[in-house]
Amino acid sequence: MRPSGRQPQEMRTVSFEPGVAKHAEGSCLVRFGDTHVLCTASLEERVPPFLKGGGQGWVTAEYGMLPRSTHERMRREAAQGKQSGRTQEIQRLVGRSLRSVVDLKALGERQISVDCDVLQADGGTRTASITGAWVALHQCIEWMRARSMISAPVLKDHVAAISCGIYQGVPVVDLDYAEDSTADTDANFVITGKGGICEIQGTAEGEPFSDEEFLSLLALAKTSIADLVRRQKEAVSA
């Protein structure tokens, strides 16, 4: 039995609240149960130096956790003078995931910076960040389209992410902190609306997991991400 009482294939309650930030071109407050992440997308009329004059844009991401997003207060990374390896890994993952579904040529020589700030953490912050960031990015691109800044389609597809794991010998989806901290296997899947796999991160905490177990996790992830994509569509069309 899962601590939350959910079935193995049951995600937490998921919601998207677009347009929550007054100043950002795109924004979304995404909730996966008690994990809440504020995602904002900001348009900048510049590109990184390595892209100057190349006629294409860029999408990048930053990730951070508020000091009291966790059970005990954690120091701000700015106060420590450097980002942790975990923070750098997650923000690169978010950026890669978003770029996988963006036509950078259609964006022109502009950069969209997506900030994912964890307000409250209860497991799955990186997967929630990716899923909410797509909604914020979509809103930013529509902001540009409404001002005739772009004409060709920029977004090629949806992208969403979900965690899966082996908990007490059972494959489960969307692990909360209680499950994630004691799971036998923990994996994150990033998948597009068409079912293409962008990234898989998987770790056996104890015994190695089998091909059969991996395929069961992949099946759970694909079903759940199809549901998340449906919810994204509802959020951006509301």
From Swiss-Prot:
What residue stretch is flagged as signal peptide? none
Q: What does the record give under GO molecular function?
A: 3'-5'-RNA exonuclease activity; tRNA binding; tRNA nucleotidyltransferase activity
Q: Which UniProt keywords apply?
A: Nucleotidyltransferase, RNA-binding, rRNA processing, Transferase, tRNA processing, tRNA-binding
Write down the chemical reaction(s) this protein catalyses: tRNA(n+1) + phosphate = tRNA(n) + a ribonucleoside 5'-diphosphate
CDD domains in the record: RNase_PH_bact
Q: Which family does it belong to?
A: Belongs to the RNase PH family.
Under HAMAP family, the record lists: RNase_PH
Query: Assembly and interactions?
Result: Homohexameric ring arranged as a trimer of dimers.
Protein name per the record: Ribonuclease PH
Identify the species of origin.
Parvibaculum lavamentivorans (strain DS-1 / DSM 13023 / NCIMB 13966)
Phylogenetic lineage: Bacteria, Pseudomonadati, Pseudomonadota, Alphaproteobacteria, Hyphomicrobiales
Record gene name: rph
